A protein has these predicted regions:
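Ser/Thr-centered flexible coil motifs
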Residues: 28-30, 65, 135, 155
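Alpha-helix boundary/interfacial micro-motifs
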Residues: 27-28, 33-35, 70, 99, ...
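Alpha-helical scaffold segments in soluble metabolic enzymes
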Residues: 1-4, 47, 51-54, 67, ...
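Glycine-rich phosphate/diphosphate-binding loop of Rossmann-like nucleotide-binding domains
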Residues: 1-60
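Adenosine-phosphate binding glycine-rich loop
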Residues: 80-181
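Long hydrophobic segments that form regular secondary structure
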Residues: 42, 46-98, 115, 130
């Protein structure tokens, strides 16, 4: 999906438990990994994170170290989405970076990435137009709608879920909360 949204494929490096998924690698490869193999000399997650602007973690607790986060580009965006424990916690990131934007899969941290924000609405839209598949255009429309919603002022009923603290778009609020009825 990120390629469909305009991310340059040559700037994307995928990793698995064996390291970087690169062109020519044979160990642990399959047709899906091969389709996204990078042309790179980078071989480890640690190397791949050096200078990176964004990292998406979908693995396990502890996969990202403070040193890896420190090595990223200025103002890095970190999606640490392993559940129940993210690859690195916001507290760990804050020890080494004061410029990071971070999201996790956990409701007790800011910027919870939760599929409940998209699934019911994407499915409702597909039903309404009698679509037989969910395509990238539908997913991108959902992404754009959520991004727009995060930039809007938060209504009183949503602010109540924050114990009266009204979130505003910024590093601590890039994703609407699941309680948001809009």
């Amino acid at each position: 999906l990120i390629k469909s949204m305009g991310f340059a494929p040559e700037n994307i490096i995928l990793c698995d438990t064996k390291g970087v998924i690169y062109q020519g690698r044979t160990e642990g490869m399959n047709q899906w990994k091969s389709a996204h193999a990078a042309k790179t000399d980078t071989r480890t997650l640690e190397e791949a994170m050096k200078g990176a602007d964004v990292v998406f973690g979908l693995s396990q607790k502890g996969a990202f170290s403070e040193e890896m986060i420190r090595s990223m580009a200025d103002r890095p965006i970190i999606f640490a989405m392993a559940n129940p424990d993210p690859e690195i916690t916001p507290e760990e990131v804050a020890r080494v970076r004061d410029d990071a934007i971070m999201a996790t899969g956990r409701s007790d941290y800011p910027n919870q990435v939760n599929n409940v924000l998209g699934f019911p609405y994407i499915f409702r839209g597909a039903l309404d137009v009698r679509a037989s598949t969910i395509n990238d255009a539908m997913k991108i429309a959902a992404v754009n709608a959520l991004a727009s919603l995060a930039r809007e002022d938060v209504p009183d009923d949503v602010a109540a879920a924050y114990q009266g603290n009204r979130p505003r778009f910024g590093a601590q609020y890039i994703i609407p909360v699941p309680f948001d009825p809009r």
